[in-house]
Amino acid sequence: MILGSLSRAGPLPLLRQPPIMQPPLDLKQILPFPLEPAPTLGLFSNYSTMDPVQKAVLSHTFGGPLLKTKRPVISCNICQIRFNSQSQAEAHYKGNRHARRVKGIEAAKTRGREPGVREPGDPAPPGSTPTNGDGVAPRPVSMENGLGPAPGSPEKQPGSPSPPSIPETGQGVTKGEGGTPAPASLPGGSKEEEEKAKRLLYCALCKVAVNSLSQLEAHNKGTKHKTILEARSGLGPIKAYPRLGPPTPGEPEAPAQDRTFHCEICNVKVNSEVQLKQHISSRRHRDGVAGKPNPLLSRHKKSRGAGELAGTLTFSKELPKSLAGGLLPSPLAVAAVMAAAAGSPLSLRPAPAAPLLQGPPITHPLLHPAPGPIRTAHGPILFSPY
């Protein structure tokens, strides 16, 4: 019984507490390999002293994914174009399209900015009075109310003469933006226009933009530019007239938009400078200047043949003889003609020349035959082989 109990109770502790198994090998802790390159490369103690090639290999092998750098945005704000590289941007900036846009913007700024107008950000020059939106300097309250200025005010001193009053009419005097009347023609206006054209590389007369001063000089020496200048001044074959009639000596010159132009070479009349430029560029005007015939007229003319030309020459040679015969008729010639007509009744009779002196025909002296024998015409002769 005791042995049996011992044998039964023996295996129970083995089932209740499993035996502790000792690992055959000591498992060391696995080293973590993070994705960042700095801790990974920190494993190598001599990384800082390595060769650059080895550093590059280790960085490529153990380093993390390369971060994509954001590409800088390269664009042209004037032309509204975006580029993929700096070389494309430089090529665009050197091109004609960008240059034309820049010149147009500069020309618009120059037109809008006159000498009497200043930009909002520009400082006011010393001694200048502020102006309102209409370009007229504001007057003091005392002047608006009808009262004169103070005795010591700089507006009007006792010894200074008062300027003459000028009626403000919109017909005779044109006021500038600064409030002063603009003169009709300035002596230095042409020089200022030439300097402005050289600065902007733009011909305002022909509406042509160029890329260099040499091209501008070549354009100014060209035929088209000179022809338009002559048309405006009226010195060349193209004359300018006002639309409503001939110009009055006392009236100022009409602007170019209100004038018509007549080309005396081609006998063509146009109503504006745009049509004049088109006509000057046409083949018809160029051929007319070169002295060539008008192709539109010569196209419809038929070439005359050699027979017609010979007949014309013969008629021109016989015309004086027929005129002389009509003026001084000889009896012998008239008798010979009548005899020839009697001998061959089917022969064609020449048309008599029209007499220069209108009146009743004188037939009696002309019908008398001339003295002497008259040779009659022979009859037809037939040739036969037999």
UniProtKB/Swiss-Prot annotation:
Expressed predominantly in the retina. GO terms for biological process: apoptotic process; DNA damage response; hemostasis; learning or memory; locomotory behavior; megakaryocyte development; mRNA localization resulting in post-transcriptional regulation of gene expression; negative regulation of intrinsic apoptotic signaling pathway in response to DNA damage by p53 class mediator. Keywords: Cell projection, Cytoplasm, DNA damage, DNA-binding, Metal-binding, Nucleus, Phosphoprotein, Repeat, RNA-binding, Transcription, Transcription regulation, Translation regulation, Ubl conjugation, Zinc, Zinc-finger. One of its GO terms (molecular function) is zinc ion binding. Residues 90-193, 279-309 are annotated as: Disordered. A zinc finger (Matrin-type) spans 74-98, 201-225, 261-285. Pfam families: zf-met (PF12874). Ubiquitinated upon prolonged exposure to genotoxic stress, which leads to proteasomal degradation of ZNF385A and releases p53/TP53 from cell-cycle arrest target gene promoters. Induction: Up-regulated by p53/TP53 in response to DNA damage and oxidative stress. It is found in: Cytoplasm; Nucleus, Nucleolus; Cell projection, Dendrite. GO terms for cellular component: chromatin; cytosol; dendrite; neuronal cell body; nucleolus; nucleoplasm; nucleus. SUPFAM superfamilies: beta-beta-alpha zinc fingers. Residues 103-121 have a biased composition (Basic and acidic residues). The modification Phosphoserine is found at residue 185. Residues 145-351 are annotated as: Necessary for binding to ITPR1, CEBPA and p53/TP53 mRNAs. The modification Phosphothreonine is found at residue 248. Interacts with ELAVL1; the interaction is indirect, mRNA-dependent and may regulate p53/TP53 expression. Interacts with p53/TP53; the interaction is direct and enhances p53/TP53 transactivation functions on cell-cycle arrest target genes, resulting in growth arrest. RNA-binding protein that affects the localization and the translation of a subset of mRNA. May play a role in adipogenesis through binding to the 3'-UTR of CEBPA mRNA and regulation of its translation. Targets ITPR1 mRNA to dendrites in Purkinje cells, and may regulate its activity-dependent translation. With ELAVL1, binds the 3'-UTR of p53/TP53 mRNAs to control their nuclear export induced by CDKN2A. Hence, may regulate p53/TP53 expression and mediate in part the CDKN2A anti-proliferative activity. May also bind CCNB1 mRNA. This is Zinc finger protein 385A. It comes from Homo sapiens.
